[in-house]
């Protein structure tokens, strides 16, 4: 239950670096979801996973909807998030950004400073990235793509997801 009496929710963003996840969060989710992202921690910080889980637990305990904006490429990454959300009675939606390696590398190349990820890191995530599904414990999976007009096209993931 959220602080305003609604059903608790968690959004887990899944996709490559520079896939549009953070922009999507700002444009579509920021008005009702608390943001948790390892990108907000100092680059060399230790214990990022534990820190992230603490922030998730705090938000859920306070009854706030929470969005986790990381690459979240595998069940090992999203499994603990799903468990925490369900333990608090929250529904969990995966926001799946299908991989476009060339597009992510182009967008990443335009980033500056610490926001730019080495190409080898983007490629490593691409190799391990797995499409999330309801069989992984998600209550729903939606697919997010660029709409070609500067926005996003969001629709339920095709069957089998």
How would you label these PLM feature ranges?
Residues 10, 65, 91-93:
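Short active-site oxyanion
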Residues 74-107:
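Mid-chain, well-packed structural core segment of small domains
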Residues 33-35, 92-94, 141-143:
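Conserved beta-strand scaffold positions in the cores of enzyme catalytic domains, especially
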Residues 27-28, 80, 84-88, 128, ...:
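Alpha-helical structural signal in soluble globular domains
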Residues 1-14, 19, 30-31, 99-161:
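Conserved GTP-binding G-domain of TRAFAC-class P-loop NTPases and closely related GTPase folds
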Residues 34-38, 89-91, 116:
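Short hydrophobic/aromatic-enriched beta-strand-loop microsegments
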Residues 14, 19-68, 73-76:
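Conserved substrate/cofactor phosphate-moiety recognition/catalytic segment
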Residues 52-56, 85, 110-114:
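Short, hinge-like loop/turn segments at secondary-structure boundaries
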């Amino acid at each position: 239950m959220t602080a305003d009496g609604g059903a608790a929710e968690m959004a887990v963003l899944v996709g490559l670096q520079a896939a549009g996840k953070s922009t999507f969060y700002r444009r579509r989710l920021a008005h009702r979801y608390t943001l948790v992202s390892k990108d907000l921690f100092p680059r060399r910080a230790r214990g990022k996973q534990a820190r992230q889980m603490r922030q998730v637990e705090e938000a859920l305990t306070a009854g706030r909807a929470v969005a986790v904006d990381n690459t979240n490429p595998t069940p090992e990454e999203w499994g603990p998030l799903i468990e925490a959300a369900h333990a608090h009675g929250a529904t969990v939606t995966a926001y799946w950004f299908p991989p476009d390696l060339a597009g992510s590398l182009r967008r990443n190349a335009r980033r500056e400073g610490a926001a730019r990820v080495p190409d080898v890191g983007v490629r490593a995530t691409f190799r391990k990235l797995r499409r999330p599904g309801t069989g992984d414990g998600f209550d729903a999976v939606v697919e997010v793509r660029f709409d070609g007009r500067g926005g996003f096209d969001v629709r339920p993931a095709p069957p089998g997801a």
